[in-house]
């Protein structure tokens, strides 16, 4: 890949029968929406007393916003919700501060969550109705989130863009409360069905010193560490993953190499609903009930990985 291309706001991965565009300002609309994702409940928190954030946190990277939703490109290394030692420096605290700066209520409703080490798109609802409708889209398979992962080992490229299915239950690791494990027969305590789709976009040759692959993934269920555990179960753990990647595997990442790359969903209000609310109609008169496609530009570690490895 041309280095000048990587330094621009977008770059393309060209493969046989593939043309993957990584764009910093990719927002597009269409009339239909199809997907396969069943997720967890809306995470709703009121951070009125916590609507201040550390001056050391990066500025919010807003991908898209209107009166009902806010889409953020979350950096790696920031937790989604406050807890323990991250009481006031979570992404939700930042969002609460942003809402307050706009004169809005500081109740934060995230549609799903991302692990601390995971970068990429995270969606927030600005009101209860939007939150409920967006969550329903996840549960009914209308919305679709696509991830990119850099994994250890050579994997044959799927030149035809085909997806492979991993359908193996996951359960809490009985020996390590921080980890999840595969529960092949589903008998471990806390076992839950988990299903992941993946397609290999690019791979090194199998004979290089430290083979690696770039994989695109979609979730049909939303379990803790699902992508990390499923890929590790195939013998291809995420590079940089201190929980599931063997220490002797060479990796260029200082965190688990996972990026929430793309998100497709429907705007939560219809044209008629928007028209009845002048606040909403300012934003939804053309795009209501349309599918919106968002893309989070790749972080520097992914760009460097691609440029160096491929």
Segments and roles (model prediction):
Residues 1-310:
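RNA pseudouridine synthases
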């Amino acid at each position: 890949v041309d280095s000048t291309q990587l330094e621009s706001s977008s770059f393309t991965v060209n493969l046989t029968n593939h043309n993957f565009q990584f764009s910093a300002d990719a927002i597009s609309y269409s009339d239909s929406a199809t997907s396969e994702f069943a997720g967890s409940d809306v995470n709703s928190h009121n951070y009125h007393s916590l609507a201040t954030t550390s001056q050391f946190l990066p500025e919010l990277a807003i991908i898209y916003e209107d009166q009902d939703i806010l889409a953020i490109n979350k950096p790696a290394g920031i937790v989604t919700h406050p807890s323990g030692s991250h009481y006031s420096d979570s992404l939700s605290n930042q969002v609460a501060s942003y809402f307050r700066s706009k004169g809005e209520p500081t109740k934060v409703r995230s549609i799903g969550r991302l692990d601390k080490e995971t970068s990429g798109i995270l969606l927030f609802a600005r009101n209860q109705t939007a939150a409920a409708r967006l969550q329903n889209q996840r549960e009914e398979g209308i919305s679709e989130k696509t991830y990119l992962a850099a994994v250890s080992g050579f994997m044959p490229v799927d030149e035809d863009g085909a997806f492979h299915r991993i359908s193996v239950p996951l359960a809490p690791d009985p020996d390590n409360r921080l980890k999840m494990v595969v529960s092949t027969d589903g008998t471990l305590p806390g076992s839950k069905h988990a299903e992941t789709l993946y397609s290999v976009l690019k791979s090194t040759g199998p004979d290089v010193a430290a083979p690696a692959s770039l994989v695109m993934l979609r979730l049909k269920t939303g379990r803790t560490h699902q992508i990390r555990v499923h890929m590790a179960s195939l013998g291809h753990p995420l590079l940089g993953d201190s929980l599931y990647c063997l220490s002797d595997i060479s990796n260029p990442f200082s965190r688990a190499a996972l990026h929430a790359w793309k998100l497709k969903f429907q705007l939560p209000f219809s044209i008629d609903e928007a028209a009845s609310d002048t606040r909403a109609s300012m934003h939804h008169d053309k795009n209501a009930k349309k599918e919106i496609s968002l893309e989070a530009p790749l972080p520097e570690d992914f760009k460097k990985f691609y440029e160096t490895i491929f």
